[in-house]
Regions:
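A structural signal for the principal folded core domain
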Residues: 1-258
């Protein structure tokens, strides 16, 4: 197994980034991520469609905009495992990147709705900066990093509750829900409640009428399957793969430089 953030994963398996139609590294579900679970990606599926895409591209029959016809598979994966290998078993789900992405999405939506209600631009982020001492990182497109996301969940929700207008306090349900998921299956141990916690989060997300992002899709569709298969929390795997990742990253660097 190897590890990386979702952008890194997509690059190494040969599919397009998260603005593409079929951008999930683990399955063939397309935006807007509605409906039942989709077929899981395999290395063989990506290899086949990337090869066909290149042939059509070279012959002039297809253009880059036609990549969705090939499930956004545009390059050969940088892995040697057999064709039948599922990406979900090959590359563990990066729990920290899920947490960061989902927390920042909740914050963005809360900021928009609070700003609209109050008439004050960036109302939530001004509260976070001045009252909660939670600073966004400019190098991360003005988003909270991992430690700041955890600080918000661990230490600042009571303070936020006091600051929020009553009609927006339901956002605390979302923050508390992702926090329960973090404790249930994002660490090295897996707790029995993880499936219910993820299902409850999905119901809340739907009730808030927030668009499903790639990271929310991965959480809802793939984290329960991965954890049930291995009977361990996500953190266990991302601890185990560090040495292998160092070895792989060296070969990836050589590949990218050539």
């Amino acid at each position: 197994m190897l590890a990386g953030d979702l952008k890194f994963i997509n690059e190494t398996i040969g599919i397009q980034g998260f603005s593409s139609t079929y951008c999930c590294p683990y399955c063939l579900k397309k935006k807007p991520w509605t409906g039942p679970h989709a077929e899981l990606r395999t290395l063989g599926h990506i290899r086949k469609h990337a090869r066909e895409f290149k042939e059509k591209l070279d012959s002039g029959e297809k253009e880059w905009r036609d990549a969705p016809e090939f499930f956004s598979s545009v390059n050969q994966p940088l892995y040697d495992e057999p064709d039948w290998t599922f990406i979900l078993w090959l590359i563990p789900i990066p729990e920290l990147h899920l947490l960061i992405g989902i927390i920042n999405k909740i914050c963005d939506v809360l900021n928009f709705r609070w700003s609209k209600l109050s008439g004050i631009k960036d109302r939530f982020y001004k509260w976070a900066d001045k009252k909660a001492k939670l600073q966004r990182q400019s190098y991360r497109d003005k988003s909270f990093n991992g430690p700041t996301c955890k600080k918000l969940l661990d230490k600042k929700l009571r303070l936020l509750r006091r600051a929020l207008p009553y009609c927006l306090r339901d956002f605390l349900l979302l923050f508390n829900s992702i926090d329960r998921i973090r404790h249930a299956c994002f660490g090295q141990k897996l707790f029995p409640s993880y499936k219910n916690e993820i299902e409850n989060f999905g119901n809340l997300w739907s009730a808030f009428k927030i668009d499903i992002t790639p990271k929310v899709h991965v959480l809802l569709d793939h984290v329960p399957v991965f954890c049930a298969h291995h009977n361990k929390g996500l953190g266990y795997f991302n601890e185990q793969v560090l040495l292998k990742t160092k070895h792989f990253s060296f070969h990836l660097l050589i590949h990218l430089l050539i």
